[in-house]
Amino acid sequence: LLVRRLHRTERVVGIDRRRFPDKPKDVIHYQVDVRRKKTRDVFRTERVAAVVHLGVLHDPRVGERERHNWNIVAFQKLLDYIVEYEVKKLVVLSSAAVYGPHADNPQFLAEDAPLLGAQGFGAIRDLIELDMLAQSFFWRHPDTETVILRPCHILGGVHNAASNYLRLERPVTVMGFDPMMQAIHELDVVRAIEHALRPGAKGIFNLRGPGEMPLSKIFRKLGTSPIPIPGALATTVLDRAFRYHLSSFPAPELDHLRYVCMVDGTRAREVLGFTPAYDLEQTIEAVVSPRA
């Protein structure tokens, strides 16, 4: 989605070990692992002006060692190339999940809130480590304008935990809990990245989305019928369903169905000039009818 917008006005070069068969004709795609030496050749020959890092591996089915190597080791190599070839802009797509859902969270979390989302979930531990590496890079290399974006739940055609969960016909909920949820349309995230690429933009920004809604109301909007289950049983049910490939929603995500993890988007609005274009109903509907 980002490439299809940027290539209209910019020269776009992609690096990914996966194929990109339907890329726009004017987009250059290098099918290489960022950790390989060939990546240095790309930076040397392409005169890179900005790097947008989207390559976080979230798949909880991937082994911890492989996931860590891809998420952390690859990102460290990327930072080395940015320094070596004096790239002037770095945009990192993190997540509001780094804050973690907790019973004592304030209603809205600011960018300086502690990153407490790693409890019992290796994929989030990696994301927090990556976020902190980007923060360290921001301070150590002021010549590169570094932007870290922390969006709330991204909804659309994307295959992430939130969208996968809301696409379930009979999603499990935790009995007695109905947390308020924030969501942002995947195309609004693309727009936020475009804002972050503007000269002068730097720092950490929460991406709040168009508003909040109780989880139960989201289900009503989608016409789905959740199955309320006691907390301890819900963990067991989801763990087994995930293990036997009956569900793509991992049990450690259950805390998002109990507690709030909502962010304050004031800084993105006032500094980046970003406001969502899609309202909350459009954002929720994008789970089943994503926009091109």
Give residue ranges: language-model regions.
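N-terminal Rossmann/SDR dinucleotide-binding element
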Residues: L1-A50
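NAD(P)H-binding glycine-rich loop region in Rossmannoid oxidoreductase-like domains
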Residues: V32-V73, Y81-E84, P101
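Conserved Rossmann-fold NAD(P)-dependent oxidoreductase catalytic core, especially the SDR/UDP-sugar
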Residues: K77-A123
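Catalytic helix-loop patch of NAD(P)-dependent Rossmann-fold dehydrogenases
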Residues: D104-I148, H153, T173-M175
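Substrate-positioning beta->alpha
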Residues: D126-E129, N160-S163, V174-L197, G203
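Mid/C-terminal beta-alpha module of Rossmann-like enzyme folds, strongest
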Residues: V190-A251, G265, E281, E285
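Amphipathic terminal alpha-helices
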Residues: E270, Y278-A292
